[in-house]
């Protein structure tokens, strides 16, 4: 069975649309898999479905970097506030 960590997260991205999730590696290695889902969205939130999160960097053992893509404008996002859920998985090897 793999090691699995997950949680909720509120963040304002950097100017280049990147943000980090801090994790505590259970085996001293970087995560083998990581994903971020934006939402849930409250009523009146008109940006639902406008952004997707791409895993951008996992070279650090205890944090994972994501970058937001703006699906409406087909470009990387700038600074934006989001809420979402994340999951990180490490293989047991």
Positions of predicted regions on the chain:
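Extracellular attachment/recognition segments
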Residues: 1-93
């Amino acid at each position: 069975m793999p090691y699995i960590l997950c949680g909720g997260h509120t963040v304002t991205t950097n100017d280049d649309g990147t943000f980090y999730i801090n994790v505590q590696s259970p085996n001293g290695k970087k995560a083998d898999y990581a994903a971020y889902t934006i939402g849930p969205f409250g009523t009146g939130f008109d940006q639902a479905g406008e952004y997707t999160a791409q895993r951008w960097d996992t070279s650090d053992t205890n944090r994972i970097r994501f970058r937001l893509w703006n699906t409406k404008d087909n470009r990387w996002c700038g600074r934006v506030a989001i809420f979402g859920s994340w999951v990180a998985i490490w293989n047991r090897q």
